[in-house]
Amino acid sequence: MTQTVYFGTYTRRDSKGIYKADFNSNKGTLENLTLVAEEPSPTYLAFDKAGHLYSVGAKDGQGGIAAFDQAGQLLNHVVEEGAPLCYVAVDEERNLVYGANYHKGQVLVYKRLADGGLELADSASHQGQGLHTNQASAHVHYADLTPDQYLITCDLGTDEVTTYDVAADGKITPLDTYKCAAGAGARHIVFHHHYKIAYLICELNSTIEVLIYDGVGHFEHLQTISTLPEDFEGANGTAAIRLSADGKFLYGSNRGHDSLAVYKILADGSLELIQIAPTNGQNPRDFNITPDQNHIIAVHQDSDNATIFKRDAESGKLTEISHDFYVPEAVCVTFK
């Protein structure tokens, strides 16, 4: 069986924009890297159910978001002065797209137009700072939906996870804020499919916080666990976090140690570290589990390679198949 994999990239060196490749799930191989669309540093991608592609985008020196049709043709940009976004997500129910702007500390809401294009519906600016040198101001790194359809943001600069109520027209109202460990740097969050549990990966202190979620935007801390070996003393920053479809295993990436941390999810939703798998590349900013759950594809921003792992569905553990497929400056892996 062949699946199409899409890659978001930086375009600082050799990359031209958004790429795709064919993944053969029987062989565990990637083939036929193809440029889908030229776009300046499309570092995060999201598809809607109709097949429109939304990416971090830029135009004429301004930053924002780009919308593409099913064939990869540009529909429009929505941009303003300053740096582009760092995260994009689709809300099918409300016909919206969400964006996070790291440099401006903003969460943005876009209305989807009839042709799949976008227009800005609302935005909110975060304020504050943290203890770490990378926390001089608010840095919103994530904006997506909770299981009960609230908007949730992770702010790396303020160590805060904020939930918003979203009106039908895209207007947002803050509901509640969870404060993670000081200097932790909240980056991304995923929610368990069965338990009222969320997993928050923190970039600056290389941890995952396990949170009890009560369903109305409120969190309580359950556990904090490291993503690193106990004896590691080098520089590291975490990046992506993914949950297996059966809810039994959790994965997080380390940049610096250049590895994937693998956790077993226990009966109360807490985590047990069971493996740290080297990715054999530099700076694994993103990875994803294939739709059939049998493989993981990790990409490396600095070494321009994709690493393919076989995933054991019973144990959750990973075995590397290869690490030599070329993808320039890749920082996002997704499937249509």
PLM regions: where:
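Loop-centered beta-sheet repeat module
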Residues: L151-S206
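A short beta-strand motif characteristic of beta-propeller blades
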Residues: E31-A37, Q73-V79, D122, G128-T133, ...
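Asp-box/WD-like beta-propeller blade repeats and closely related beta-sheet repeat scaffolds
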Residues: L74-Y142
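Beta-rich, blade/repeat-based domains predominating
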Residues: E39-K49, E81-E92, G128-D148, C180-Y195, ...
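Blade-loop segments of beta-propeller domains
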Residues: N32-R94
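Short loop/turn segments immediately following the C-termini of beta-strands
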Residues: Y10-R12, A58-D60, Y102-K104, R112, ...
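Short loop/turn segments immediately following beta-strands, especially the blade-tip
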Residues: D22-G28, Q70-A71, Y110-E119, D165-K171, ...
